[in-house]
């Protein structure tokens, strides 16, 4: 991916992206949060200092894809981003498996494609970076294993969407699993099976940079 002048990079998703970011503030110490978008923003801001980039985060903790889509006008299109990085899906799988009230995989795909179509209709030059949703079964329960398998299926949907829209796809699950295996402890990567540790966020950011070649 080429990093152009005056890029506006928007990070979107759930709590993994949110990182306890500030709300309604332009305070540069807080508005990005403390998750992988902060690591990426810090790196890219310095590397491309002469290109005057801007970085925004609108991830909201607890959101599934439908909830993100419901606010997409305000938190997506109206911001006029030139690059949009999306990581979403763990709450869709969690609600579907745990409470049987989340989006089905078919609905997930439909909403995702609709969101991209509507964005490109108004911002045709916007580029997407679609990150693979991930999960780890840290408690050994059947429910967690079902959620893990559901996430794997949704990841394949995201990968196919990225291919269809000629977008960048960032694979993460196998990479995170490999680090967990190396350390012999899944919680050192995703402390509760969902949320990355400092190490986990660093792994995600490094992979994002590797795949985008930025």
Task: Please report, for each region that a protein language model flagged, where it lies by residue.
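Serine-esterase "nucleophile elbow" of acetyl-processing enzymes
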Residues: 1-58, 73-80
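Alpha-helical cap/lid subdomain in secreted, periplasmic
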Residues: 2-4, 42-54, 63, 67-214
């Amino acid at each position: 991916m080429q990093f152009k002048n005056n890029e506006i990079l928007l990070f979107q998703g759930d709590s993994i992206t949110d990182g306890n970011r500030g709300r309604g503030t332009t305070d540069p110490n807080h508005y990005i949060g403390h998750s992988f978008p902060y690591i990426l923003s810090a790196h890219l801001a310095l590397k491309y200092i002469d290109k005057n980039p801007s970085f925004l985060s609108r991830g909201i903790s607890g959101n599934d894809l439908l909830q993100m889509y419901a606010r997409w006008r305000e938190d997506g299109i109206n911001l006029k981003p030139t690059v949009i990085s999306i990581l979403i899906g763990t709450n869709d799988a969690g609600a579907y498996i745990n409470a049987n009230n989340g989006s089905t995989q078919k609905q997930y795909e439909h909403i995702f494609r609709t969101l991209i179509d509507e964005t490109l209709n108004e911002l045709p030059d916007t580029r997407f970076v679609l990150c693979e949703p991930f999960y780890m079964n840290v408690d050994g329960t059947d429910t967690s294993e079902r959620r893990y398998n559901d996430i794997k299926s949704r990841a394949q949907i995201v990968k196919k969407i990225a291919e269809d829209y000629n977008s960048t796809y960032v694979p993460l699950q196998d990479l995170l699993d490999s680090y967990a295996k190396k350390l012999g402890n899944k919680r050192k990567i995703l402390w509760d099976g969902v949320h990355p540790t400092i190490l986990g966020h660093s792994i995600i950011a490094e992979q994002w940079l590797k795949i985008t070649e930025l």
